[in-house]
Amino acid sequence: MTDQQYQLLQKFKLDKSKISYRTHYNPMLLQPIPRTIHRELLGISSISLPFQGADFWTLYELSWLNKYGLPQVAIGEMIIDATSDNLIESQSLKLYLNSINQTCFSSEQELRNTLITDITKCINSQVKITIHSLSQWMTVPILEFTGECIDNQSIQIDNDNYIFNSNLLVNSVEREKVKETLVSHLLKSNCPITNQPDWGSVQISYYGMRINREALLRYLISFRKYKIFHEQCVEQIYCDIMQFCLPNTLSVYVRYNRRGGLDINPWRSNISYSPVNRPLARQ
C-alpha cells in the first residue's frame, strides 16, 4: 500500500464518537471502502476484472427483537460479489449490527430485507443473505482445506522477511507443469483502519509451472506486518502469483479467523470455481 493510498484510507477511520455501541437502528454506521483504492495499485480495471470471486461473511452475533420484544439470535451468512463497487469496513458492520440488537422486527424476513437493503446501498451492488437458526448451524461440519500444507518447512525466517515483498516470488517456478493445491495456515496481515491482526488460512489451486514451496511460504509470511483488508489481501496474492508464476489457471481462497463476531472469507479465480463455504477449525 502506497503512502498516498494509506492517507486516503485515513478519512475512512471511524470517528471515535461513533465507535460507542448504539442501541437504535442506524444504517448510516455502515462504512463503504472503494475497491478501486487497492485495485489501482495492482493495475486492475474494475471494468474488466482479471478474475471472478466473492467475499463470504459470517455474522455470528446477529440479534434483534421480535414483535413481542423477545430477543432473537441467529447466525447470518452474507455473500458479496467481487464486482461490487465497495467493500464494507468490518468494524462499521459490527456497529451497524449492534444497532439492530434493540430493534423490533415483525418477522425474520423483515430483518433480512432490512439487511439486504442497507448493505446493498453500502456496497452499491446486490448481496445475498441467509439467516440460520442455531440448530441449523450446529449441523454445519468443520471444513479442512484440501491440498498439501507447505508450513512445516525447515527454513530460517529473518526479520526482513516480515516486511511485505512481492519480489519473493521472482524466479520461483520450475519448468515442470503441475496441477496442484497448496495450503498454508500462517497468513497474517493487519487491518489498515484499526491495526488489529487478521489471521488466515489460504488455499492456492493452480495449473502451471511448479511453484517453489519455500518461496511461496516466505512470500505469504511477508504479509505479517502489512496493513491490508482481507479482500485486498486475496487479490494481492492472486495478482502476484499470476505476475511472477504465470499459471494457466489460478484460484485463491482465504478464510480468516473471526474478529468482532465476524469472519470474512474471500476467493478469486480465473476459472469456474465453487469453493465450499464452511468454517475451518480456527473459526
Swiss-Prot record:
Signal peptide: none annotated. Pathway: tRNA modification; tRNA-queuosine biosynthesis. It catalyses: 7-aminomethyl-7-carbaguanine + 2 NADP(+) = 7-cyano-7-deazaguanine + 2 NADPH + 3 H(+). Substrate binds at residues 88-90, 230-231. Its EC number is 1.7.1.13. Gene3D superfamilies: 3.30.1130.10. One of its GO terms (biological process) is tRNA modification. NADPH binds at residues 90-91, 259-260. This is NADPH-dependent 7-cyano-7-deazaguanine reductase. It comes from Baumannia cicadellinicola subsp. Homalodisca coagulata. The lineage of its organism: Bacteria, Pseudomonadati, Pseudomonadota, Gammaproteobacteria, Candidatus Palibaumannia. The gene is queF.
